[in-house]
Amino acid sequence: MSHSKVRWDFWNIISGGLMVLFLIFLVYPIGRLLKESVYTDGKFTMEAFRMFFSKSYYYESIFHSVKIAFCVMAASLLLGIPFAYFYSFFRLGGRKLLFVLCLLCTMSAPFIGAYAWILLMGNSGLITGILKSFGINGVSIYGFGGIVFVQTLKLFPLVVIYMNGAFRDIDNSLLEAAESMGCKGVDRFKRVIMALTMPTILAAALLVFMRSFADFGTPVLIGRGYSTFPVLIYNQYLGENGTNYHFAAAISVIAVLVTAVIFIIQKTASNRFKFTINALHPVCLLYTSPSPRDS
């Protein structure tokens, strides 16, 4: 019998190294997390999961986190898709500067963005003080609405980045063919452009959902008692009332399961729109003014 020899070339070594890193930094931590959630003092128990689902304060955090993530995802798509569309199809004044500013929003830590909005719209914030001088009270950055608002401004640039690439991959001949058949304006956008970019839209939606669901900095600063998964896990590990590692591990396992379900739903939906776009004729930018000069 002849045995094939493994070729230890550069790429095989890289592949093996990546596999080892994957096992160490992903599989092993999740395995330990699962073990900690069902083993207490060396005994198998589901007490941590029972405690989680027995109190509304705990299990409502599932709905709070998912609700925030869905709202942020929807708002980010509503902002990001039109932004990317006009940037990709039109020569707007200052378009490059706007795109750079949009990218800068993704580079700051969540704590920085949340704290900045506290300075603007907190109880003693600049905008809050101006509104109070005009007799407008009750405007606050804290709570559910504030979390959604701050996270949306932080995450919608991810949609812009994804959709800008997708729009530029559309073959201009398809758009010209649609126009020749009478499909123009909003109808062309819905029936042609949106259909061609649907896989990218779903991918961007999943990314925003996951980032929002896992965000800790924004809810802990402006949540004001609105419990979310990351804050709940943090409080169990480093809370003022002591630590409960097993309960925190159980909450983390539930969070992993929720994100896995969302991922499966996204993959199932994206499989319905699986195709490849090759822009043999890139999209021609339209001018919004008589000047053909790009900003």
Range-by-range predicted roles:
Residues 2-4, 46-50, 59, 94-97, ...:
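Membrane-interfacial helix termini and adjacent extracytoplasmic/periplasmic loops
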Residues 12, 17-60, 66, 134, ...:
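Short membrane-interfacial helix/loop motifs at transmembrane-helix boundaries
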